[in-house]
Amino acid sequence: MTTEEESLSPGEEGYSVQRDFWRQAAKSDGFDLENVKRPPGMNGVVIGLIPYYCQLYNRYPYRILVDLFAKVGLHRYNLFKGTSFEVAALIKFNMLQNYMSSFYMTLLAHDPDPAASSLEKTFQVRVDEQDYGTLHITCSIARIKAEGNLLVVHYFPYIFFNKISLSLLINNECCIVSTETPFIPHFQGGARAYGIFKGELPDWPSDDAFNDGKRFYLVKESEWQSTDWISMYLELVITTTDRSITETRQKTEVLSQLEIVKVAIETANEDVEPPNERLKAKSAHVYITFKGLAEPRAPRRVFENGEHVERQAIVRRVMDHTGYLTLKGKLCGGEYIKKRSLALKSGEESQDCKKQARVG
């Protein structure tokens, strides 16, 4: 230990170790921590990324959600590149110790297209949660590992944290860590949205509105069955709204009971030929009618129970020119309550996704 290091106060030493951790983690954009070193006795001091090795240990936290986030990354890559990659295996992931976290995942994927190579590719996927108790995530990285660019690394001299989200306050020096943008452990931005894709999610349209063929494309059953991202969107809405599905008991049976009844797509460009090309739109609202969810749960809402009940979910997809993909969604219906003990009164309806005609 140098004389300078010996003279550091405990607080200064903590900052120094914290800074050094993120400097090392930034070299791999947060994906590879195997060679990140920490001084002895400092593991509890450094607030950083927690690594999980999925092929060594069968049990890891948020398993259902992490698996879905890995699929989101490949969905982004496929939209951007026109490929059809599917998850073969999750190798590892690192996550922040935050209420709303960021996930840095490494996985194997293959493209079932006969014209594609049969070899599996190693992908790196980053997904940041933007909200808790609802679907609002951004995927900013989805790449084949071998295609990653070299990094130009500078580092934050001081890093501070709060309990809800990771805040970075920079003193004295600037940090630029990435191929294109600064490395920030928890990214709170998103894809740039325009027009009907800005602001709050829309209300659930009326039955008559769905008959407007210029506004909506009604997805054929054969199309949604062959399009795995539609069921993925639905599962994301349900698991992010009811975190008990993925946090503790890993209730996979809940998702296996879901049955899609109807799907409609709304895009900004209404004159697309053939109409099913709207499925590939970078920005879209996806309206999903489904059943099979016996006991829906959402913060401060109660629902009518029963697998037979048809329910609605809305998902907004926005992917901008940078490749950022933001997904925002909600489970419709239910009755808002002030206290958890209050029950849904017969005949009352939530205003969250009330049906109304499109304005403008």
Predicted regions: what they are:
Residues 1-360:
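N- and C-terminal low-complexity/disordered segments
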